[in-house]
Amino acid sequence: MDVSEWQDGLPLSAAAAAGHRFAIVRACDGTYADPVFASHVADARGAGLRVGAYWYVRHPLEGTSLREQAGVVARQLRAAWGPSLDDAPAVWLDAETVAHRLSADDLVAAARALEDAGVACAGTYTTRSYWRLRRFPAFGDGADEMPGGLWLAQWPGTAGPAGADYPGDDHRAWRPFRGRTPDLWQFTDRGSVAGFTVDVDAFRGDEGELAALLAGRGPGTEPSGG
C-alpha cells in the first residue's frame, strides 16, 4: 500500500494484520514536505512492514526546480532515518502531474537530482495513459533511458477491504509495458484499512526481492510468483 498525509492517523499495524507486506510513504509533493512522513515511517517500521518512499514530482514550470524538490526529499529521509541515510530506501518518482506534463528528460534529471542529494532512485510510478501520452522510452540503464523500476497504476474498478479485491498475479496489468514487466502494480485507489481509504499495491516476488526493489536494487529482475 502507499500512504500520505491523507491517511494521517491510520494505524499501519492494522495494515500488517491484514496481510500487507510493505508501505510506500510520500515524502513530498514538489517542495511541500508531507507533515506525517516521519510518523508514517516510524509506524510502518514498528508494525514490521518494509518501507519505501515516493516523491510527487512537479514540473519546474510549476514553480520549483527538480534540485529544490530533491533537497526536500533528502531532508525528509534524514529526519526519518538519520543523517547517514544508511538504512533509508530508494525513492520512487511519482510522474502524474498534469499542469505541465513531465518528459522523459525531466524524470532522468529528477533521478540525477536525487543522486546528487545522496538519495537513490527506485524507479518511476505512473499510469499507462500518462506514459503513452508522453511517448516515454523503454526502461533500462542507458543514459537516455528511464531510471530504475516500474510501478504502474491501473485500476480495474473494484473496491473493498485492502487486498481482498486483488485481481491476481495473471491479470493483464502485469503484462510487459515499454520493455518492462511492472515491478509493482497499484490495482486500486479504493482499498480500505481501519476505516481509511488507501491505494493498494501488489508485488509478486519474495521478501528478498521486495527488499531489493525498495532499496533500489531490483529493476531488471523478473518477480517470482507467490
List each language-model region with its residue ranges:
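Alpha-helix boundary/capping detector
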Residues: 41, 70, 140-141, 210
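Catalytic domains of cell-wall/extracellular-matrix polysaccharide-remodeling enzymes
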Residues: 84-172
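Functionally critical loop-and-helix segments that line ligand-binding/catalytic clefts
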Residues: 2-4, 141-226
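Substrate-binding cleft of extracellular glycoside hydrolase catalytic domains
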Residues: 2-16, 21, 25-120
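Positions that flank functional sites
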Residues: 30, 59, 129-130, 192
